[in-house]
Amino acid sequence: MPSTTRTSNSQNEIVMRLSGSDRVLVIMAKAPRPGAVKTRLTPNLSPEAVTAFYCCLLDDTLALARSLETAGVEVAIMCPGSDVNELARLAGTQLLGKAASVVAQKGEGLAAGLTSVFAHFAEAHRTNAHRTNAHRRRIIAFNSDSPHLPRSVLEDAFETLAAHDVVVGPTHDGGYYLVGAKASHPTLFAGDGMGTSSAMERLLSRARALELSVGFADRFYDIDTADDLSRLAEELRLAPARAPRTAAWLKEWESTAH
């Protein structure tokens, strides 16, 4: 059972103590503020509409993550320090009473956030200096805009990570929607290229330089552009249960846009 929520004096971390599972799914998120999230959608949607849409994505992503808890996977959120309190409040209905945490990243940007994920969750689990590779904690960082991803893909990614140093879920645009590791590798996300069409290739190049074995999850897509939005709307029209809150928002958006 998790202990009572603790808030640090610096407000950098709000934590419900982890139970020690060997698998953690960490959602990379931001507080939903106009102009701060999914900005590439603003030519087609107002900043306020984008923010409302992002809230739906985040809610459904948390629900997807929570569905893995029955299999012993812990759920956490990594975010900028200024967003911790707001995300903890918004995620309260999803995380209340569960073994989960909302943790502030160290530094700015996605690369710093990903580095923080593995530094925080791998180091927190290092209770035995002689822990074997097979029993090291498997940590996967997952974006907050692919709530329609089949749960089986996440389950398979954890299995793939058991046999490799790193697991990557490629996107169709050259990036990646998830990345996992069993240890902290500070240079794995160093340099530029995050959020670009060369992001995955740069990651693989750094993994090779570190002599890390890499396994792959299924290729998928996240929601960055108007085309992605239309594709998602079409898929959820046929299967709204995959991301119900997002599906409802898209249905209303389509009815007012046409």
Residue ranges of predicted features:
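Short phosphate-binding loop-to-helix
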Residues: 88-137
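Short beta-strand-to-loop acidic/aromatic patch adjacent to the donor-nucleotide binding site
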Residues: 136-144
